[in-house]
């Protein structure tokens, strides 16, 4: 492999050396990688109002998401340090936020126990009535969240849940196809936690 010129732009480096291993065209992420950016995100974390805003999807400025999940998922922030960081916030917000951290911890333990066997006993196929199947391309809400996922690598938790439910129960798509699609694009993708 030829030497990478670190003075080149990120786009030039990715397109020259890594284009064949990516699924999308190059674009700048809404997340900056590395420990210093993870630490900065944690230090700037403000969960005031989190409990009330947690399930907001749109408009984006009303979301309660912490946007820490990529840093947690890739090991730059530990659940323990994030847990401690929110200790001084109001009880309701702190409790709701910590519930989400506990879900991450639970999913890690469950995955450690069952691994990929979850496909065998935790999931099932739903055969929908063909007359009730919804075509995604005719639904603005679906195309909007898919476009956001593909362009940012992120979906807020509430969107992940209703999108997954929609794909499972309102289309004839096998659940694993949707899981693979989301995992392919999510910068914080976790097959068990998501």
List where the protein language model places each region.
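Contiguous, well-ordered alpha-helical segments that form the cores/surfaces of helical PPI scaffolds
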Residues: 66-69, 105, 130, 140-148, ...
